[in-house]
Amino acid sequence: MVSLISAHLLSLPSSAPRSRPQSRPPLSPPAAAAAASCSFDLPRPRRLVADGSRRKGTMAAAIPPEASGLAHDLGSAAVTAGVALALLRFFEELAKRGVFEQKLNRKLVHITIGMVFLLFWPLFSSGSYAPFLAAVAPGINIIRMLLLGLGVMKNEAMVKSMSRSGDPRELLKGPLYYATTITFATSIFWRTSPIAIALICNLCAGDGIADIVGRRLGQEKLPYNPNKSYAGSIAMALAGFMASIGYMHYFQSFGFIEESWSLAFGFLVVSVTAALVESHPISTHLDDNLTVPLTSFLVGSLVF
């Protein structure tokens, strides 16, 4: 039995020994370069922060510069109008409480509104629409003067702070000319023109200081106009000139204009001429808020 089993096992075919995997021959340089070109790396997971910043950059690039400048100027116009409104409300409250006499309060409004308004011009961009958006604040005052002067809107405190007699119809003259002048200077000439500086500084600082000084130190009257004094006219010329020089330097620091001695001399000529016209009786019959800016515009067009 055992011999039969042994004979059967010997008759079975022996299994071939397992061959070890033979190492491949090294590739030639051209074949290696081709194999490397076919290989690829799996993409690494990107961080969410990097992806978010890329998305923000894409969105910012999609917004045209004109749109971003317009949004900036709209915000600047809102800030400027808000400050102007706050100043008017402040002087209205002073008029209600009787902190200053009515004439002095009116002249403080006259000086402050225009001078502070100029400070906000550098907030706006260099876009072509910027001066018109900047003119929104004084433009709103034009509408308010019309509504108050025509009796459509009532505001006794504002009328008291901006008129001589408290009559609302008075706002249709001097205060309306005042707001129109600032709107015109802003939208037409803007911050690169010395004419705009001369217009607003002589109207606001010059004319305002002339009345304050003239009422307190104006004993010596002018020979051609007993309602005006030497002190008031000299104060107007100096105040308008100094304010113009100050804003020339202010706008030069932002690169809007280039200050020079010739420009300073031009401001002096405009301020002296405006003071002479303001002292003439014709300014009393018309309105110095009309004659002073007209003079500043005409003379400024010649000297600048």
Swiss-Prot record:
Under InterPro entries, the record lists: Phytol/farnesol_kinase
Q: What does this protein do?
A: Involved in the activation and reutilization of phytol from chlorophyll degradation in plant metabolism, including tocopherol biosynthesis. Catalyzes the conversion of phytol to phytol monophosphate (PMP).
Gene Ontology CC annotation, any one: chloroplast membrane
- Extract one GO BP annotation from the record: vitamin E biosynthetic process
The reaction(s) this protein catalyses: phytol + CTP = phytyl phosphate + CDP + H(+)
Q: For this protein, what is any one GO molecular function term?
A: phytol kinase activity
Indicate how the chain sits in the lipid bilayer.
Answer: Multi-pass membrane protein
Transit peptide interval: 1-59
Q: What keywords were assigned to this record?
A: Chloroplast, Kinase, Membrane, Plastid, Transferase, Transit peptide, Transmembrane, Transmembrane helix
User: Which organism does this record belong to?
Assistant: Oryza sativa subsp. japonica
Q: What is its EC number?
A: 2.7.1.182
- Places the protein is found: Plastid, Chloroplast membrane
Recorded metabolic or biological pathway in which this protein acts: Cofactor biosynthesis; tocopherol biosynthesis
- Uppermost EC category: transferase
Annotated transmembrane regions: 68-88, 113-133, 134-154, 170-190, 194-214, 231-251, 256-276
Q: What is this protein called?
A: Probable phytol kinase 2, chloroplastic
Name the predominant localization.
Answer: plastid
Instruction: Family membership, please give it.
Output: Belongs to the polyprenol kinase family.
Q: What is the lineage of its organism?
A: Eukaryota, Viridiplantae, Streptophyta, Embryophyta, Tracheophyta
